[in-house]
A protein has these predicted regions:
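S-adenosylmethionine/decaboxylated-SAM
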Residues: 2-200
């Protein structure tokens, strides 16, 4: 199937990380937190199809933020549902991330990726809420280890501070990319859960 994520509004530069995760897994459960209009979700879904993998994908977004600076995009949930329609293996979940975590059994997820709120406090809560849900040998990652484009300093370094505190140096960084407008995206991070991991 030809990729069409380029035609969807949004921010997305972690293609390499997603390709790597699909390549590593089969008969697996993936979760994406922060879907917006489905740009990254649809890229991941096409990769799953093209690599002929049996992977179920849950896409989680509360769309609570549409009441503030994103209010002009109130159609985001409907656009998202339309964009994922070709993929029978995607399950949309319209819940807050911390509430959605309660829907999953411990050690049931092979890979989870966050692109949600970027404050240190929220990132800490989110990682701790979801970490028990990840299988031993599974992966947890997220976008914007540093969020260069955010005007509020607490969101620029919030995710990175949380990841450093929880995982120390036990994670890998994927460099961010520059978009066509010259905006540099922050790097993404990826941690592999092992028995000796700090939390879980």
């Amino acid at each position: 199937m030809k990729h069409f994520y380029q035609d969807i509004q949004g921010w997305f530069d972690f293609q390499d990380l997603y390709k790597e995760m699909v390549k590593k897994h089969d008969n697996a459960k993936f979760v994406e937190v922060g879907a917006w209009k489905g740009k990254s979700t649809c890229f991941l879904a096409v990769e799953i199809l093209n690599q002929k993998k049996k992977i179920k994908l849950d896409a989680i977004d509360s769309y609570e933020y549409l009441t503030d600076e994103f209010s002009y995009n109130k159609d985001a949930p409907d656009v998202f549902k339309k964009n994922i329609k070709p993929f029978k293996f995607i399950k949309p979940i319209f819940k807050n991330s911390l509430k959605a975590a309660k829907l999953y059994k411990n050690k049931s997820i092979d890979f989870i990726f966050f692109d949600s709120e970027h404050s240190e406090e929220y990132a800490m809560k989110e990682i701790k809420a979801w970490y028990p849900k990840v299988k031993i040998g599974g992966y947890m990652g997220g976008h914007d280890y540093v969020c260069f484009v955010h005007p509020d300093p607490k969101y620029v370094i919030g995710v990175g501070k949380a990841v450093n505190k929880i995982f120390d140096n036990n994670f890998k960084l994927y460099p961010g990319k520059t978009d066509k407008n010259g905006n540099l995206y922050g790097p993404s991070w990826l941690h592999k859960k092992r028995k000796e991991s700090i939390i879980g």
